[in-house]
Swiss-Prot record:
The active site is at residues 78, 96. The lineage of its organism: Eukaryota, Fungi, Dikarya, Ascomycota, Saccharomycotina. SMART domains: AlaDh_PNT_C (SM01002), AlaDh_PNT_N (SM01003). Its EC number is 1.5.1.7. Pathway: Amino-acid biosynthesis; L-lysine biosynthesis via AAA pathway; L-lysine from L-alpha-aminoadipate (fungal route): step 3/3. One of its GO terms (cellular component) is cytoplasm. It comes from Yarrowia lipolytica (strain CLIB 122 / E 150). Pfam families: AlaDh_PNT_C (PF01262), AlaDh_PNT_N (PF05222). Belongs to the AlaDH/PNT family. Disulfide bonds join 205-249. Keywords: Amino-acid biosynthesis, Disulfide bond, Lysine biosynthesis, NAD, Oxidoreductase. It is an enzyme of class 1 (oxidoreductase). This is Saccharopine dehydrogenase [NAD(+), L-lysine-forming]. L-saccharopine binds at residues 19, 78, 101, 131, 135, 279-281. Monomer.
Length: 369
């Protein structure tokens, strides 16, 4: 009989990252299937440590994955802290190093240096090439929430002020209620409800953005849905400048012309005052929203775009948006990932894992190029 798979859930280290790759619910199912699950203590995680203990997981110290036995598979969400020591375990995580992101070679080279392996969560795909688990829906939902909140803030505050920091909500209802209240305050001051243009409207992310817009009371005729059909002629697009809020939800798989540029932005006739780049391909040389250079944070959700005409323009480029709703986002993601995790004992033959390993090997070969 093969030895049980040992999963070690590491504590996330990114500030304000409350999500978790495993939840108490999915941990129980893994334990029932014969896995061993070690969970690092975490003051940040939306789930209490005790919730994992209650389902039978073994609690271990935060950061102990570094010296954990090599037969444990290390699972987490966001990239590891920037260190240089070689990585000797098998890791399951989002690593953001396969699309030529800034510093990708430094990130990726740590794995072959220690004879470790990376199974990148972004590239775990089923037989149809569809990702088995993604945070897209909640990323779009949270991004739209911050976008609408920013727009409402602009209507009720002077241009010299930016939207203050936001923090995680315990559940979706509280978030929706807060945005509704902000919108009502803007309308009370004489503003009409905003028009929202969503690019990537047919995907998970776009669906989440549209769902938020509806739930906070933005009328259907104010929600403009674009997908590949509408963008195939190539940008930049005047229609973006004519909307109040632009939400970019596309998955960037190849270079495309920019959706927006300064020629469109630097006009008195521009209506656009909020851009939410949910895709947040900030360091990607082909970012289709090339009007900002930094990833924003929950502490400072937006940065102003340097324009010479038209209303104030704020951009939100937070790269961990689903953390605004960490409990729902984690439950949905982990439940979607579970069938693949249950195949880990057969990872040498199960297609979802062999494809991910082949992709890792392919990109490792590129390091020396």
């Amino acid at each position: 009989m093969t030895a049980p798979v040992k999963l070690h859930l590491r504590a996330e280290t990114k500030p304000l990252e409350h999500r978790s790759a495993l939840t108490p619910t999915t941990t129980r199912k893994l334990l029932d299937a014969g896995f061993e699950v070690f969970v690092e203590k975490s003051p940040l995680r939306i789930f209490d440590d005790q919730e994992f203990v209650d389902v039978g997981a073994t609690l271990v110290e935060e950061g102990s994955w570094v010296s954990a036995p090599e037969d444990r598979m290390i699972i987490g969400l966001k990239e590891l802290p920037e260190e240089s020591f070689p990585l000797s375990h098998e890791h399951i995580q989002f690593a953001h190093c396969y699309k030529d992101q800034g510093g990708w070679k430094d990130v990726l080279s740590r794995f072959p240096a220690g004879n470790g392996t990376l199974y990148d969560l972004e590239f775990l795909e089923d037989d149809n090439g569809r990702r088995v688990a993604a945070f897209g829906f909640h990323a779009g939902f949270a991004g739209a929430a911050i976008g609408v909140e920013t727009w409402a803030f602009q209507q009720t505050h002077p241009d010299s002020e930016n939207l203050p920091g936001v923090s995680a909500y315990p559940n979706e209802t509280e978030l929706v209620d807060k945005i509704k209240k902000d919108l009502a305050a803007a309308v009370e001051k004489g503003s009409k409800l905003p028009t929202v243009l969503v690019i990537g409207a047919l995907g998970r992310c776009g669906s989440g953005a549209i769902d938020l817009a509806r739930k906070v009371g933005i009328p259907e005729e104010n929600i403009i849905r674009w997908d590949m059909n509408e963008t195939k002629k190539g940008g930049p697009f005047q229609e973006i400048a004519d909307a109040d809020i632009f939400i970019n939800c596309i998955y960037l798989s190849q270079p495309i012309p920019p959706f927006i540029n300064y020629d469109l932005l630097n006009k008195e006739t521009r209506k656009l005052s909020v851009i939410v780049d949910v895709s947040a391909d900030t360091t990607n040389p082909h970012n289709p929203v090339p009007v900002y250079t930094i990833a924003t944070t929950f502490d400072h959700p937006t940065v102003p775009v340097e324009t010479t005409a038209g209303p104030k323009l704020s951009v939100c480029s937070i790269d961990h948006l689903p953390s605004l709703l960490p409990r729902e986002a984690s439950e949905a993601f982990s439940e979607a990932l579970l069938p693949s995790l249950l195949q880990l004992p057969q990872r040498d033959t199960a297609p979802v894992w062999t494809r991910a390993k082949a992709l890792f090997d392919k990109h490792v070969l590129r390091i020396g190029e």
